[in-house]
Curated annotation (Swiss-Prot):
SUPFAM superfamilies: Ribosomal protein L1 (SSF56808)
GO biological process, one term: regulation of translation
InterPro entries listed in its UniProt record: Ribosom_uL1_bac-type (IPR005878), Ribosomal_uL1 (IPR002143), Ribosomal_uL1-like (IPR023674), Ribosomal_uL1/biogenesis (IPR028364), Ribosomal_uL1_3-a/b-sand (IPR016095), Ribosomal_uL1_CS (IPR023673)
Protein name: Large ribosomal subunit protein uL1
PANTHER family linked to this entry: 54S RIBOSOMAL PROTEIN L1, MITOCHONDRIAL, LARGE RIBOSOMAL SUBUNIT PROTEIN UL1M
Presence of keyword Ribonucleoprotein: yes
Length: 234
């Protein structure tokens, strides 16, 4: 058996794996256990009551967190004409068409989000094998293929998170940084859960939000008592 590190022993002693924590208590615990030399992200895992094997029960979308994610996001936009100018004005770092595609083909990937206007998809389509595996391919379901590229850029900069269930029906995303105030993390979590409830597939039966867990980048997961979450209770 692998030897437990000092950090792992502290986590084991502090976190009760059988307990569901009130959100405020959970955040306080995560802050206490976040001892990395960088500001760790607070990540959430939401187990959904869906059959992920069925395409009509998959959950995918995006929402803007009210308090952002604490991350600086670089945005690339495929657009031309007035849309290109609007994207630049909204703060996009990279804007172009074939010239931007050529940069990406050369391996220049200095961005976190890719947005495209519908008329630019003829150019973006040829980049599927590069952008797809990295989760960067623009998609109308998450608002990254849109005629209003300026709004999409502003959303990305404001702390929009994209979500998509994995093969086990679990959503993984971030809701901020461990140095956020507890209330801000709770507000972000509530906003995500509201978005997930709105995205509930009509074919999903039974309990939809089955489990909510929070963790930091380097820490253990803490199960959340859903009775204290307005988004779940309502």
């Amino acid at each position: 058996m692998a030897k437990l590190t000092k950090r792992m022993r502290v986590i084991r002693d502090k976190v009760d794996a059988t307990k569901q924590y009130d959100i405020t208590e959970a955040v306080a615990l995560l802050k206490e256990l976040a001892t990395a030399k960088f500001v760790e992200s607070v990540d959430v895992a939401v187990n959904l009551g869906i059959d992920a094997r069925k395409s009509d029960q998959n959950v995918r979308g995006a929402t803007v967190l009210p308090n952002g994610t604490g991350r600086s996001v670089r945005v690339a936009v495929f657009a031309q004409g007035p849309n290109a100018e609007a994207a630049k004005a909204a703060g996009a770092e990279l804007v172009g068409m074939e010239d931007l595609a050529d940069q990406i083909k050369k391996g220049e990937m200095n961005f976190d989000v890719v947005i495209a206007s519908p008329d630019a998809m003829r150019v973006v389509g040829q980049l599927g094998q590069i952008l797809g595996p990295r989760g960067l391919m623009p998609n109308p379901k998450v608002g990254t293929v849109t005629p209003n590229v300026a709004e999409a850029v502003k959303n990305a900069k404001a702390g929009q998170v994209r979500y998509r269930n994995d093969k086990n029906g679990i959503i993984h995303t971030t809701i901020g940084k461990v140095d956020f105030e507890s209330d801000k993390l709770k507000e972000n979590l509530e906003a995500l859960l509201v978005a997930l409830k709105k995205a509930k597939p009509s074919q999903a039966k039974g309990v939809y939000i089955k489990k909510v867990s929070l963790s930091t980048t380097m820490g253990a997961g803490v199960a959340i008592d859903q009775s204290g979450l307005t988004a779940v209770a309502n």
